[in-house]
């Protein structure tokens, strides 16, 4: 199943609307400022996923994975292999997310990884019975893809999970509210990775409010039209003072 960006946005909007009514009740549609998606509750209480932590790779390259049926995950490490049993509807996140001193630092990355795995499970439920059967003994690992890398069906599955995960973690409604509150609805200017002090401050407040990393926020904001990209040569920040 290959979906367009628009279709993925529609799925995310439907899921978050239903979850908000489930989780927040009557408060779901009250006038308010932007709020972070309670992704742990969405995973466990709404989707019924079992979330746990383990060492998933020797170099930290695997952030998380999820299983559609009982299976196993084999890790090759220092010339030997280690097997981790996986149960249906289980999400396994890398143990680095809960190590002392890293919980706060990696909070945004952990939340995005969990949203990514939730997206895999949501997309799996939309597949045909034939496709579900072919996927059931597989696990979906969290990796990063750009459009130019999409060569196989697995690549597309990963890209779609990234996009859907981002839309669930940062729903357009919450982004609109956050940008209105923290940036007065203006477009942020990205000069090849650098922002003016004013835009950088607005971006930082948005990230804190929604519980996401700067990298994830920039990608999402760009997609929703809240970031304009310009060459670094045009960069000018009136707040900066050069000695």
Predicted segments with their positions:
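Active-site hotspot residues in diverse enzymes, especially metal/ion-binding acidic/histidine motifs
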Residues: 1-243
């Amino acid at each position: 199943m290959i979906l367009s960006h628009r279709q993925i946005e529609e799925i995310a909007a439907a899921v978050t609307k239903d979850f908000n009514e489930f989780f927040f009740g009557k408060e779901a549609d009250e006038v308010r400022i932007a709020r972070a998606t309670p992704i742990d509750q969405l995973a466990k209480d709404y989707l019924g996923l079992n979330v746990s932590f383990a060492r998933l790779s020797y170099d930290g390259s695997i952030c998380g994975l999820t299983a559609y049926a009982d299976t196993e995950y084999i890790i090759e490490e220092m010339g030997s292999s280690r097997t981790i049993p996986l149960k249906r509807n289980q999400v396994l996140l890398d143990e680095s997310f809960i190590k002392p001193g890293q919980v706060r630092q990696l909070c945004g990355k952990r939340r995005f990884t969990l949203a990514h795995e939730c997206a895999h499970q949501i997309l799996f439920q939309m597949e045909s019975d034939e496709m579900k059967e072919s996927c059931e003994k597989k696990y979906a690992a969290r990796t990063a893809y750009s459009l130019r890398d999409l060569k196989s069906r697995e690549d597309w599955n990963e890209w779609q999970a990234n996009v859907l995960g981002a839309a669930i973690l940062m729903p357009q409604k919450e982004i609109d509210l956050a940008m209105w509150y923290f940036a007065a609805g203006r477009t942020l200017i990205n000069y090849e990775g650098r922002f003016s002090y004013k835009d950088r401050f607005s971006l930082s407040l948005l990230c804190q409010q929604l519980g996401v990393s700067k990298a994830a926020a920039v990608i999402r904001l760009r997609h929703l039209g809240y970031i304009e990209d310009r060459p670094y040569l045009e960069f000018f920040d009136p707040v900066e003072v050069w000695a």
